[in-house]
Amino acid sequence: MKDIRQQITVGIVCLVWLALALLTGEALSPAPLRLFSAAGTTVAIVALAYERSLWQWKLVRRFTGIPLLHGTWRGEVVTSVIREDGDPVPPIPAVLHVVQSASRVSVSLFTADSVSTSTHASLLRGDDGRWCLRWQFTNQPRPGARQRSQRHRGVAELWIGAVPGEGLSGEYFTDRRTYGELTFVEWSPRRYGSASTALAATDFALVAPYAAS
């Protein structure tokens, strides 16, 4: 979105320059046009590079403060659901995968029984300076779990810790009137396609402060 706005700005400047030249009757020189074209191309390339990767650089994030969440997180879900025998469901091992650019973020949450994918997600900074990841999701139970759980929607939010080891913690709510707590304290830069492979992996580590890591 930012790169589009920048290209539009350059285009408007070119049009204004062209209109003024036509109104004053001045001859049009190709040199300024080449200059504006080169400037527009440069702005577009830099904006694209920032959107995809430059924003992740430590030095850049020290100025922007944007937390780096991109990667795979490992933790657990504590749900309000009660089993048929009346006992609460034990904590559920879970894996959170975050895809992040400078302006966009998407979230997928995997457990042994289901996969949740975000339909809308955003990274927000609160009045107290803390960052929060919020998203709306659709949960699709795996075939073996559909007798006890149906497809449903919900919302979730995770507050981002500020010191090593705090990780991500928050809660979720669903349209089935269930809710629960989410906690993720281990992180890996790799992308995993299932909960089982991520939970068995050995390359996860406790997280560090994100704006400075």
PLM segments and residue spans:
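N-terminal glycine/threonine-rich, aromatic-flanked beta-hairpin/loop signature
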Residues: 85-126
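Generic detector of short, locally flexible boundary/turn motifs and exposed helical patches
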Residues: 35-42, 62-63, 71-74, 86, ...
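Charged, amphipathic alpha-helical segments
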Residues: 58, 90-92, 150-155
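Beta-strand secondary-structure signal
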Residues: 70-74, 95-97, 106-108, 132-134, ...
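Beta-strand elements of well-folded, non-transmembrane domains
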Residues: 77-81, 98-102, 111-113, 139-141, ...
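Tryptophan-anchored aromatic micro-motifs
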Residues: 65-89, 109, 168-174
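Amphipathic/hydrophobic helical signal segments and adjacent flexible N-terminal regions
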Residues: 1-70, 78-81, 183-213
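Cytosol-/stroma-facing membrane-proximal "stalk/adaptor" domains immediately downstream
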Residues: 117-213
